């Protein structure tokens, strides 16, 4: 089975850090924040195998460009294979 290299953009990392900070600081749930951060990171890393398993987005021109969406709990991960 083919494996892909997964590269996380600086913007995506910043978004993940902001999610963590909001849950940890605003909601005062640091353990929940770490769990959410880890679930998102694990889901992103899982794209190294079968990244086509998630659907293309419906909007254009993003669909034509190959943009896909993966849901992780209440969050969306957008990526291109």
Features from the language model and the residues they span:
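Basic, Lys/Arg-enriched alpha-helical interface segments
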Residues: 1-67
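Enriched for short, Lys/Arg-rich terminal
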Residues: 27, 68, 72-81
